[in-house]
Amino acid sequence: NEAFSRAFVGLMRTIAPDTFIFCMGASATYGVAREMGQPVVREFYADRGYNLDGTIVFARSVNRFDNKTVAEKVVRACREGKVQTDDGEDIDIGFESICVHSDTPGATELLETIRAALKANGIAVAPVSQTG
């Protein structure tokens, strides 16, 4: 919602102008933050499906994922900048951060699997402040 994003980013510009906002690249918040000069980081949601427009599939309940499959999805997104949507189509995806939600069953183990897969594929993990 653009009106909410403008209010939120405007408030952030007032109280925390150097604080990163983490959000979907395909969101109004991302566009508004860039327009208003607020530091913004696009997130890749490892534990969520994607729609054709690059937004995530919102689920009322989160199922346990196959950790290896999710890790492969993350590695592919890092290497190729692509993710397969829930419709089976590949879309471009740009991001600077990888998110796993804490309410995802087995989130800790999933993160460990993702981290190991990134390391095995020579993909560095670094603080956002060091990603350029």
Language model region names:
Residues 1-13, 28:
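N-terminal active-site wall of soluble small-molecule enzyme domains
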Residues 13, 34, 119:
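Anion (oxyanion) recognition and catalysis
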Residues 18, 81-92, 124-131:
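Flexible, glycine/charged-enriched surface loops at secondary-structure junctions
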Residues 100:
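Conserved, mostly hydrophobic/aromatic
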